[in-house]
Every structure is written in structure tokens, then in C-alpha cells.
């Protein structure tokens, strides 16, 4: 039996591509990623015929070459950003790639021989399904990725973002301490997003500034502590102002609730 083609749908920064990497690790397979954003030529998928100057295989076969195996986990990133023009429709070319009944004989124009893609586990990502053609969408099983809550962002930052940023900047864990209060303030007052990309940028900004301070101190025993009181020294003025409840009831004034991709808000 053929497996389903997975489509991860969610706002930027919610971990869609990372889940694809985790699937590859869990299955013990090679991982390859193809960015489809802005592709508007069918030849980018199927390849160019050899009669053209500068002809080369399509991105699918290039990815298979990079993986070096016949059964990788292939992530097709930003499948909702495909475009089309006089060069053809790349989304239509993907129909053969993602159809389990047809991809066992996928033919790249450059190679001009059938190639079996049936052993490849395809994972697609998109921010929305509105721009994905219906025939292509019907071939995939859509899985929605909701935005993270403040509590989830806190734990992601503690377990993953901060350790990774410290390692990238070459800072030992004991040299930089970001208090829980400061981390929560970053989430609530410096970022407003469904994912954690802006949160990651804020943490990296703090680590870069801390690295400069540590170099100036020239002491391996130096320790920098980032708290709520000195957080503005690293990130500047807060960007998000938490809504305050009305102190007094005024005639003709009501409090409204709103929902966006970044979460809830008070009007």
C-alpha cells in the first residue's frame, strides 16, 4: 500500500519543516528539502530537454542525487507559493510526482528515462491552502499546525532556542543567564506571532550583545544575567503593549475580542 502525501499547513515559524526533519530521523532515512517558493517554470520540476543550452535535470532528480538513496524523506517547502506563466504550470507537473499511481514511472525531460519515486516519502508545507490548485490539494492529506501558546513558546525557548543560540555564539551556559521573568517578558512584549521566529531573533540578539560584553571583560568567570529590569538594554523599548482593562466604565465604550493568526487580542 502507498503512504499518504502529508501537507503541513500553518503560519510561518510553527515548525513544519522541523517536523519533516524529525520524521526522517525517526525513520532512519535521508532528508532532502526543495524550496518551491516563486517557481513558475514547469522545467524546474520536470527538467529541461537536452536540446536547450544549459539544460539540466529538474529539482526532483537533483534532490534524489543529493540524497544518494531511493527512499529519502523529501520536503517540498512552500508549495502554496508556486506560480505559473508561459513556461508552464509547475503545480500541474507536481501532480505526477505526488500521485502514487504515476510516480513509479516519473520521467525527467533531461534524463528521458522513467524513474521510480514510489519509495520516496513526500512531505509538503504551506502557509495556506487557498492558493493550492484543487487537483493537487486532493492528492495530499492536510494537517493543520496551530500557533503556539505563550507557555509552549516558553518551554521551546528554554529547551531548544536558548541552548542553540548559546552554542552558535560560542557562549558557555554558565556565562549567560536569562531569567524566567525576562523570557516571559520577551514573549509577551517583544513578539507577536504564531511561531517562534521573532522569539529566536530576540534571543540571538541578546546572545550577540552578551558575547561582546564577555569579550570586553576578558574573564572566563564573568557571568551576565538578563532580567526584566535590564532587558531593555539588550532589546530596546518593548514592541507590544499588553492590553489593560478599562479602569472605569464609559458610556458607549465596549471591549471587543479579536482573533488573528498571531493569537487573540483585545480591541
Question: What role is predicted for each listed range?
Answer:
Residues 2-4, 27-28, 46, 54, ...:
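Short loop/turn elements that form and flank the Walker-type P-loop nucleotide-binding site
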Residues 76-116, 138:
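Conserved catalytic/switch belt of AAA+ P-loop NTPases
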Residues 26-56, 63, 83, 152:
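AAA+/P-loop NTPase substrate/partner-engagement loops
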Residues 10, 47, 78:
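The Walker A (P-loop) glycine that initiates the GxxxxGKT/S ATP-binding motif of P-loop NTPases
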Residues 197, 201-267:
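C-terminal engagement/docking regions of AAA+ P-loop ATPases
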Residues 68, 128-138, 142-204, 209-223:
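Conserved C-terminal "switch" segment of AAA+ ATPases
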Residues 2-36, 65-66, 95, 99:
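Walker A/P-loop
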Residues 67-71, 89-92, 107-126, 176-179, ...:
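AAA+/SF3 P-loop NTPase mechanochemical coupling elements
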Amino acid at each position: 500500500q502507498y503512504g499518504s502525501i502529508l501537507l503541513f499547513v500553518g503560519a510561518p515559524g510553527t515548525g513544519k519543516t522541523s517536523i519533516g526533519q524529525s520524521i526522517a530521523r525517526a525513520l532512519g532515512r535521508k532528508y532532502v528539502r526543495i524550496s518551491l517558493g516563486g517557481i513558475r517554470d514547469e522545467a524546474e520540476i520536470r527538467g529541461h530537454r537536452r536540446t536547450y543550452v544549459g539544460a539540466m535535470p529538474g529539482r526532483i532528480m537533483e534532490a534524489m542525487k543529493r540524497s544518494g538513496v531511493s527512499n529519502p524523506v523529501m520536503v517540498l517547502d512552500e508549495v502554496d507559493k508556486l506560480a505559473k506563466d508561459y513556461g508552464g504550470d509547475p503545480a500541474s507537473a507536481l501532480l505526477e510526482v505526488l500521485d502514487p499511481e504515476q510516480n513509479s514511472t516519473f520521467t525527467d525531460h533531461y534524463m528521458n528515462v522513467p524513474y521510480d519515486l514510489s519509495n520516496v516519502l513526500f512531505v509538503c508545507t504551506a502557509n495556506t491552502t487557498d492558493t493550492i490548485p484543487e487537483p493537487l490539494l486532493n492528492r495530499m492529506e492536510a494537517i493543520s499546525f496551530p500557533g503556539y501558546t505563550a507557555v509552549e513558546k516558553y518551554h521551546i525557548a528554554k529547551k531548544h532556542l536558548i541552548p542553540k543560540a548559546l552554542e552558535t555564539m560560542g557562549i558557555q551556559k554558565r556565562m549567560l543567564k536569562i531569567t524566567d521573568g525576562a523570557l516571559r517578558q520577551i514573549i509577551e512584549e517583544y513578539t507577536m506571532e504564531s511561531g517562534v521566529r521573532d522569539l529566536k531573533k530576540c534571543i540571538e540578539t541578546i546572545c550577540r550583545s552578551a558575547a561582546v560584553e564577555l569579550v570586553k571583560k576578558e574573564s572566563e568567570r564573568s557571568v551576565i544575567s538578563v532580567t526584566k529590569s535590564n532587558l531593555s538594554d539588550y532589546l530596546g523599548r518593548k514592541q507590544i503593549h499588553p492590553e489593560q482593562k478599562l479602569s472605569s466604565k464609559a458610556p458607549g465604550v465596549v471591549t471587543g475580542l479579536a482573533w488573528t493568526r498571531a493569537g487573540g487580542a483585545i480591541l
